[in-house]
Amino acid sequence: MIIIVTGTPGVGKTVASKKLSETLNLNYLSLSQFVIENKLYTEYDELRQSYIIDEDKVKEELEKIISASHLVIETIYPSLISTADLVVVLRKNPFSLYNELKGRGWADIKVAENVEAEILGVISQEAREAFKDKVCEVDTTEMSTEQILNKILNKQCDGPIEWLVDTKVQRFLEELDKIISSYENDI
């Protein structure tokens, strides 16, 4: 059994994935840690404080371990994984997510790009394109780990979640775009 838990940074992937793997007695794999430990990246982006992954190498190495494993895989890149029984996309209210990421001390550009990705549903769309009806979206806003886990185990999906129906979120997206645009010369 392969379960993918995905979503933008700050939505609760790590805690939910670890708890899910423990509850279902499955192994846990953080794709980010896997990439770093196996040097499956091409460079380090100083501006965003992130590694740029080598997608081909990641896919190749994942194939070696997925075929014979029962895993919960935590990732922001669901389409790099070739197979899954369930894909859980954790989502979070963009305003809450912004506060979460700012609280981590991340650079403004990194916060803005990640919150924009959440608003636009980038990871959700990627998951749906790769896994279609195996996708379950869960809104983690103001939820405990136990509540999130319960929704996953009972396949109580909230999605597809559309943040852009809220005019406040639309205005927030415009502000995020201004932040991102201010870094254009650095990108």
Swiss-Prot record:
| Enzyme type, top EC level | transferase
Reaction it catalyzes: AMP + ATP = 2 ADP; ATP + H2O = ADP + phosphate + H(+)
Q: Which UniProt keywords apply?
A: ATP-binding, Kinase, Nucleotide-binding, Ribosome biogenesis, rRNA processing, Transferase
Source organism's superkingdom? Archaea
Q: Which GO terms describe its biological process?
A: ribosomal small subunit biogenesis; rRNA processing
Binding residue positions for ATP: G10, G12, K13, T14, V15, R104
Q: Which Pfam families match?
A: AAA_18
Region: LID, residue numbers? 103-113
GO MF annotation: an example: ATP binding
Q: Where is this region: NMP?
A: 30-53
Keyword Transferase on this protein? yes
EC number(s) on record?
2.7.4.3
Keyword Kinase in annotation: yes
Task: Write down the HAMAP family for this protein, in alphabetical order.
Answer: Adenylate_kinase_AK6
Q: Which family does the UniProt entry place this protein in? A: Belongs to the adenylate kinase family. AK6 subfamily.
Subunit note: Interacts with uS11. Not a structural component of 40S pre-ribosomes, but transiently interacts with them by binding to uS11.
What does this gene product do? Broad-specificity nucleoside monophosphate (NMP) kinase that catalyzes the reversible transfer of the terminal phosphate group between nucleoside triphosphates and monophosphates. Also has ATPase activity. Involved in the late maturation steps of the 30S ribosomal particles, specifically 16S rRNA maturation. While NMP activity is not required for ribosome maturation, ATPase activity is. Associates transiently with small ribosomal subunit protein uS11. ATP hydrolysis breaks the interaction with uS11.
- Listed name of the protein: Putative adenylate kinase
